[in-house]
Curated annotation (Swiss-Prot):
<dbReference type="InterPro" id="IPR006083">
    <property type="entry name" value="PRK/URK"/>
</dbReference>
<protein>
    <recommendedName>
        <fullName>Pantothenate kinase</fullName>
        <ecNumber>2.7.1.33</ecNumber>
    </recommendedName>
</protein>
<comment type="similarity">
    <text>Belongs to the prokaryotic pantothenate kinase family.</text>
</comment>
<keyword id="KW-0173">Coenzyme A biosynthesis</keyword>
<dbReference type="InterPro" id="IPR027417">
    <property type="entry name" value="P-loop_NTPase"/>
</dbReference>
<dbReference type="GO" id="GO:0005524">
    <property type="term" value="F:ATP binding"/>
</dbReference>
<keyword id="KW-0547">Nucleotide-binding</keyword>
<dbReference type="GO" id="GO:0015937">
    <property type="term" value="P:coenzyme A biosynthetic process"/>
</dbReference>
<keyword id="KW-0808">Transferase</keyword>
<keyword id="KW-0418">Kinase</keyword>
<keyword id="KW-0067">ATP-binding</keyword>
<feature type="binding site">
    <location>
        <begin position="97"/>
        <end position="104"/>
    </location>
    <ligand>
        <name>ATP</name>
    </ligand>
</feature>
<dbReference type="Pfam" id="PF00485">
    <property type="entry name" value="PRK"/>
</dbReference>
<dbReference type="GO" id="GO:0005737">
    <property type="term" value="C:cytoplasm"/>
</dbReference>
<dbReference type="InterPro" id="IPR004566">
    <property type="entry name" value="PanK"/>
</dbReference>
<comment type="pathway">
    <text>Cofactor biosynthesis; coenzyme A biosynthesis; CoA from (R)-pantothenate: step 1/5.</text>
</comment>
<dbReference type="GO" id="GO:0004594">
    <property type="term" value="F:pantothenate kinase activity"/>
</dbReference>
Length: 312
C-alpha cells in the first residue's frame, strides 16, 4: 500500500500502485475517440487511459453514489421528500491547472469515461473561458493585459451558473468563448439541463476567498500539475504548432503570429509566457493545488506517473 513518511491528509501513488485500483472497470473508449479528445501537443494514449483515468473514473463513480446517499440523509433529517432518482443533485467536478498543462484533455477524457456509466450518463463539460469579461469590458477596466487572471472573470455570473446547476434548475446557461476571436461570442449560450455530473474546467476554479467561491460547491477537485519549466516548454511547442493550425485562419485574433519564423515565434511565446502565464500560475493557480482532491503529476513527456489523493 502507498504510504507517507509522516501523518498527512494525502496518500501518494506511483502509476503502478494507482492502476491496480482500476479493478474490473472496462475500457469503453476507442483509439479513434481518444484522438478526438486529445489536445494539441498532448501525448495521452489508451494505456494511460487504462492505468490513470479508469481508476479515477471508478473513484468518482463511487463518490457520486456516496454523495447521493448523503443528500438523502440530509433530506430525511429535514423532513423533506426524497429526491427524484431521475433528477439527482448534480455532482460537480473542478479541473484546474496552468495554461498548456493539458487540463482540457483531462476534462474531456473524464467526461467521455464517466458518461459510459449507466448511473450517470448525463455529463456536461463547461470551461470558465465563457465567464471572462468581454474584451470591451476588459478594455474599460484596463484589464486586457490581465486576461486569465482572477479579476478578468465575471465571478458572480460563474457562481450563479454553478449554483443554478447544483440546486436542480431545469436549465442553466453559460456564455461561450471563441478562441479564434479571442472574445465572448455575443448572444451564444451553452445550455446545461440538469446533468448527473458537471465538469467545470479552468485556470482558477479551485480558488478560495473571504466569501463563498465556486470551489466551495465542488464535490471533487482535480489539479493537473507539472514542473513550471516543463509547462513553459509545452506552451512554446504548442505556440509553434499553432502557426499552421489555429493561427493560420485569417479570422484568428492571433493570425499575425502565423508568418513568424521559429526564432521569432519562440521569442514571442516566451515573452507571453513570462509576462502573463507564468506570473498567473505562480501567483494564483499553483497556490490552489492543496485544494484539490486529486493531483495528477506529469513528467516532461506529458505522461502521468505520480498521483496524490486527499483522503481526509
Amino acid at each position: 500500500m502507498p504510504r507517507l513518511s509522516e501523518p498527512s491528509p494525502y496518500v501518494e501513488f506511483d502509476r503502478k500502485q494507482w492502476r491496480a485500483l482500476r479493478m474490473s472497470t472496462p475500457l469503453a473508449l476507442t483509439e479513434e475517440e481518444l484522438v478526438g479528445l486529445r489536445g494539441l501537443g498532448e501525448q495521452i494514449d489508451l494505456l494511460e487511459v487504462e492505468e490513470v483515468y479508469l481508476p479515477l473514473a471508478r473513484l468518482i463513480h463511487l463518490q457520486v453514489a456516496a454523495r447521493q446517499r448523503l443528500f438523502a440523509a440530509t433530506a430525511e433529517f429535514l423532513g423533506e421528500p426524497q429526491q427524484n432518482p431521475d433528477r439527482p443533485v448534480p455532482f460537480v467536478i473542478g479541473v484546474a491547472g496552468s495554461v498548456a498543462v493539458g487540463k482540457s484533455t483531462t476534462a474531456r477524457v473524464l467526461q467521455a469515461l464517466l458518461a459510459r456509466w449507466d448511473h450517470h450518463p448525463r455529463v456536461d463539460l463547461v470551461t470558465t473561458d465563457g465567464f471572462l469579461y468581454p474584451n470591451a469590458e476588459l478594455d474599460r477596466r484596463n484589464l486586457m493585459h490581465r486576461k486569465g487572471f482572477p479579476e478578468s472573470y465575471n465571478r458572480r455570473a460563474l457562481m450563479r451558473f454553478v449554483t443554478s446547476v447544483k440546486s436542480g434548475s431545469d436549465y442553466a446557461c453559460a456564455p461561450v468563448y471563441s478562441h479564434l476571436k479571442y472574445d465572448i461570442i455575443p448572444g451564444a449560450k451553452h445550455v446545461v439541463r440538469h446533468p448527473d455530473i458537471l465538469i467545470l474546467e479552468g485556470l482558477n476554479v479551485l480558488q478560495t476567498g473571504p466569501t463563498l467561491m465556486v470551489s466551495d460547491l465542488f464535490d471533487f477537485g482535480i489539479y493537473v500539475d507539472a514542473r513550471i519549466e516543463d509547462i513553459e516548454q509545452w506552451y512554446i511547442s504548442r505556440f509553434l504548432a499553432m502557426r499552421s493550425t489555429a493561427f493560420a485562419d485569417p479570422e484568428s485574433h492571433f493570425h499575425h503570429y502565423a508568418a513568424l519564423n521559429d526564432t521569432k515565434a519562440v521569442a514571442a511565446a516566451r515573452e507571453i509566457w513570462r509576462s502573463i502565464n507564468r506570473p498567473n500560475l505562480v501567483e494564483n493557480i499553483l497556490p490552489t493545488r492543496p485544494r484539490a482532491t486529486l493531483v495528477l503529476r506529469k513528467d516532461a513527456d506529458h505522461s502521468i506517473n505520480r498521483l496524490r489523493l486527499r483522503k481526509l
